[in-house]
Amino acid sequence: FPALAGQKDLCEMVAFCDIIEERAKAACEQYGVPGAKYYVDYKELLKDETIDVVHVCTPNVAHSPITVAAFEAGKHVMCEKPMAHNTEAAQAMLDAWKKSGKKFTIGYQNRFRQDTQLLHKACEAGEFGDIYFAKSHAIRRRAVPTWGVFPNKALQGGGPLIDIGTHALDITLWCMDNYKPVSVVGSVYEKMGHSALAAQGNMVGEWDPETFEVED
């Protein structure tokens, strides 16, 4: 919200929605333009014909249904990454977007970093020749998110791979011209999440090892 609120020449934040009314009201009062509204049901928000763009910032499991509904309501959509918690939900988003004729983007802000822009331009110019192999890495030590529902697999769908790994994969695929994979193989593991000792050394607060459900 603060970043968007600071772009007053580009957008106006006219409506907010949260299933917890107090949060929606607080965000509306702090970041909204005069006369901004707040809702507890996104379906009611989507009925407002004055809204042009919807920014989806919910737990991952809700990305797809809200995005699909927004397209059906004639809105442009920016959705936070990852697109969804599974491929079926992501495909539903793509199908709704193509049918709507509206604009759609995922919150991969690292594409706009200066170093990433430089790398992408070099790849486009052919400075690295024919790129046929690439590795991507994402490391964040002892910084497991402890806010919201991050360790809840049902609501988030996964851990660091869809949290920070997705940024590394996006930049890699983007620089390689977003080719279409023939097949995908992956694996994850978990160990630290269930360790009380690891939880105590976290940079952004501790978590309950008993409720940690995603890979780490």
Provide a role label for each language-model segment.
Residues 1-32, 172:
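N-terminal Rossmann-like dinucleotide-binding module
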Residues 14, 36, 52:
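Conserved acidic residues
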Residues 16, 54, 134:
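Receiver (REC) domain switch-region micro-motif
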Residues 21-22, 103, 137:
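Catalytic cores of eukaryotic secretory-pathway lumenal/extracellular enzymes that build
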Residues 35-42:
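Conserved SAM-binding strand-loop segment of SAM-dependent methyltransferases
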Residues 53, 59-60, 64-111, 126:
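Beta-strand-loop-alpha-helix segment that lines the small-molecule cofactor/substrate pocket
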Residues 110-213:
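Predominantly a Rossmann-like dinucleotide-binding segment in NAD(P)-dependent oxidoreductases
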